Amino acid sequence: QAVIVDKEISKEFEKLMKEADCYFLNKEETEKLEKSMFENEKLKSEIAGQSPYNIAKAAGIEIPEKTKVIVVPQTGIGPGHPFSKEKLSPVLAYYIVPNSDKGIETAEKLIEFGGLGHSAVIHSEDEETINKFSNRVKVGRIIVNSPSTHGAIGDIYNTNMPSLTLGCGTFGGNSTTANVSSVNLINIKRVAKRRVN
C-alpha cells in the first residue's frame, strides 16, 4: 500500500490527510517503525490487522489513539526499502513526484517489486494520464477516482464483481485477473458434437 502524490498538490494532500486523522512519521519514527514491523525486510506476522495506534506503540512511537493511518514518507523502492512492499496494515508508504509521468513510473516500480497483477488506483481528471497509467501498470484492476479498497472489491463504486478474493492473472502467477466469485468455482462440462463450420 502506497500513495504517490504530485508535488504540486502534496501540501494540500498532507493537510487533508491530517484532517482525516492520519499521522505522518518523521525520519526517526520511520526508522523505529521499520525495525518493529520488519525482520530481514519481511513483514512480521503480528502486524497484520493491527490498529495504527498498536503498531506505533509496539515501535515505541506515540501517536493519537484515534489515528486511522500511519503515513511513512519514502523515496526508495525495492530491496532495502521494506515500506515499498505490501504491509497488510493501515500503514501507507508516501512518495512525492514532480509530475504524472514520474508518478506512473513510480507506480510501475512499486507494482513490479510487490503486487504484480493486483490493483492500482489513479485520481485524475486528465484522460490522457488515466489512459497512460492504465496501459503501463501491470495489474488486473485499475480503479479511477474511487476509494481503492472498496473500488477493487467491486460493486459499491463500479460494476466489478463483488469479491474479497482478487485474481492477479499471469502477472501474479494466477489463472484469472477477475474478482473471484462462485462463477470461478463451478465446473462446467461442455459437450461438443461434430459439425462443419
Where are these regions (language model features)?
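Short cationic amphipathic helices and targeting signals
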Residues: Q1-V5, V91-Y94, A120-I122
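Short beta-strand and adjoining strand-loop segment in the mid-core
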Residues: A2-E8, G169-F171
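C-terminal segments
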Residues: F24-E65, V72, V121-N197
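NAD(P)-dependent aldehyde/semialdehyde dehydrogenase
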Residues: E8-K11, K15-L116
